[in-house]
Amino acid sequence: MAEQTELKYDIYQPFGPSVLKTTLPRSFINLLNAEADRILHDEKLSKEHDWSHNLAGNVKKEVAIDQNKIPNFPEFMITMAKQYYKHTIEKDPIEGSKVGFRVWVVSQYAGDFNPMHIHDANLSGVAFLKIPPGFDAEYAKEDHHPTAGCLEFLGSIPNHFARHSYIAKPQVGDFYLFPSWLTHQVYPFRSEGERRSLAFNIHFTMDKPIKGVNV
């Protein structure tokens, strides 16, 4: 009988973008929803904070919010951005850089959608704050390639052994971070109620270039 030897191997992913996923602490979810409610439920404030003219979405409301009104949230976004770069390029282009944010809330209802688009920044992110009560049942009913209300990231050209898309089913608290140039879209849904998400861009300018880093 041939001698059994333990196979040792590594699998590398040298090409294509990475997507970071984590869970938003409940304290942030509550504070972000409270600030979103304050603006969304007031027609005057909704108009003052309207951000839809800068966005691709076909949705009920998209309103800008001030991240500094959420204690420690800017620091949380920076921490996640640092972790993303630590994993992808093993360097920290944010340290010592000038960092800016643009944060907004997307309030969607049945039939709303967001077509394929990219963002103008360094990193972008999405966090889910609310989903309709009947969303899970609607998703489960779609027995073939369920996508109702889902976020989809689109990468390379379809090919053997190369995944070209990733579909993220919304769950309250899920937080995604990705390169701003990564194409993504949001599918419509039919359930009654609000699908609410937080979207943001992180911009930074390096005072001193880092060798091998192009961001």
Annotate each PLM feature.
Residues 197:
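A domain-level signal for the structural core that forms small-molecule/cofactor-binding pockets
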Residues 182-185:
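Short, charged beta-turn/beta-strand-edge "cap" motif at the junction between a beta-strand
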Residues 2-93, 111-114:
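Non-heme Fe(II)/2-oxoglutarate
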Residues 101-177, 187, 194, 204, ...:
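Catalytic core of non-heme Fe(II) oxygenases with the double-stranded beta-helix
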Residues 90-102:
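A short coil-to-beta-strand element that immediately follows conserved catalytic motifs
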